[in-house]
From Swiss-Prot:
Coiled coil: none
CDD domains tied to this protein: AdoMet_MTases
EC category: transferase
Protein name according to UniProt: Malonyl-[acyl-carrier protein] O-methyltransferase 1
Species name: Ilyobacter polytropus (strain ATCC 51220 / DSM 2926 / LMG 16218 / CuHBu1)
Domain of life: Bacteria
Swiss-Prot/TrEMBL keywords: Biotin biosynthesis, Methyltransferase, S-adenosyl-L-methionine, Transferase
Length: 268
């Protein structure tokens, strides 16, 4: 079974740090939608953002929580440096280069935010168990991630080209995410939407993915020849486009969770 290679994730996002904002239309849409679920406050909170990237959602956190202490965490040093340049110096900001699964601070957080990051973590149950341990009681998590219909056109086209060929990582269904998070949290909100992108061809689509550092981070990624790309483009275009464009579906999930004292209680 293919698993996500964290070292490759780091390398890919570091290479894409400078071009990320030019291609990150989906991530910007997700940030705008996620912000709808966030109620700001002038109170001082301890806040963690997981996967701050170039600071797209970080800017929204700063605006909504101007008096809070905010830790911005990302696995990629280059992403963190880009976020620093964008956000500027602030005594309320602390930048951390770390994999969230290895992050074990002494303090607890009141709020955890994450935009378009959790899809890069294989074991979602383990992730949310860990996030539970980082939150104070009554603390909340608000996040966006990618759902199971993301890039379904690419997966179907690849399967038609070669049934053994796998390219993009597995994305979860909303009901699967609900089942995972309901074990430890009270679910305050759960929603999904779709963002359709259009590209001239498959190469342009994959170039855009590479531009944000999101090119496949699977450890069993196989190389494509020019002939395979040409064949893939024809299959994709015939099924999910026309002579001018191809359609790319992004299935987006949003959730808000609250940590409760009885983590094993069957909450309603």
């Amino acid at each position: 079974m293919a698993i996500i290679d964290k070292k490759r994730v780091n390398q890919n996002f570091s290479r894409g740090a400078k071009t990320y904002d030019n291609y990150a239309q989906v991530q910007k849409h997700m940030a705008d939608k996620l912000e709808i679920f966030v109620h700001g406050s002038k109170k001082q909170y301890n806040i963690l953002e997981v996967g701050c990237g170039t600071g797209i959602f970080s800017q929204k956190i700063l605006k909504r929580f101007p008096n809070s202490k905010i830790d911005l965490l990302d696995i990629s040093p280059a992403m963190v440096e880009t976020a620093k340049e964008k956000l500027g110096d602030s005594p309320n900001l602390n930048f951390i280069v770390e994999d969230v699964e290895n992050y074990n601070p002494e303090k607890k957080y009141d709020l955890i935010f994450s935009n378009a990051t959790f899809q890069w973590i294989d074991d979602q149950m383990r992730l949310f168990n860990h996030l539970y341990s980082l939150l104070d009681y009554g603390g909340k998590i608000a996040f966006s991630t990618f759902g199971n219909k993301t890039y379904f056109e690419l997966r179907e086209s690849l399967s038609t080209l070669d049934p053994e060929l796998k390219y993009s990582q597995k994305f979860v269904k909303l009901d699967e995410m609900t089942e995972i998070t309901n074990k430890n949290f009270r679910i305050l909100a759960a929603d999904e939407d779709f963002f359709i992108e259009k590209f001239e061809n498959v190469m342009a689509f994959l170039k855009a993915i590479k531009g944000i550092g999101s090119n496949s981070a699977l450890s069993n990624k196989r190389n494509f020849t020019r002939e395979k790309f040409k064949a893939l483009d024809k299959i994709y275009r015939d099924k999910f486009g026309d002579k001018n464009i191809i359609n790319v579906t992004n299935h987006l999930l949003y959730m808000v969770l609250e940590k409760v004292k009885m983590r094993d209680e069957n909450l309603k």
